[in-house]
UniProtKB/Swiss-Prot annotation:
Protein name in UniProt: Uncharacterized protein MJ0350
């Protein structure tokens, strides 16, 4: 019986660790977006059209990754909630 409890606890802890990892990754991506936007603001109008387009693409990619991570976080939170608390 102790193994069952340990298994549930371990699974729950692993899910929480994954959630926290994704949250940290999202924070890093948001910081990256802020850096890209600052750079974009600085080079705008200076004749660096290719660089501007590349920065815009990078910003879009970061936003897509953040959205994907948020969906994954929601799914993982649902899984954590499905694990019965009385087995902890």
């Amino acid at each position: 019986m102790a193994k069952v409890r340990h298994g549930c606890r371990t699974e729950r802890i692993e899910l929480i660790i994954k959630i926290n990892h994704l949250k940290r990754e999202n924070l890093k991506l948001r910081n990256k977006i802020a850096d890209y936007k600052r750079t974009l603001y600085l080079i705008r109008g200076k004749g660096c059209k290719l660089t501007e387009e590349l920065l815009k693409i990078e910003i879009e990619n970061c936003i897509k990754m953040i959205k994907f991570n948020e969906e994954t976080i929601r799914d993982l939170k649902e899984k954590v909630e499905m694990i019965p608390n009385e087995q902890l």
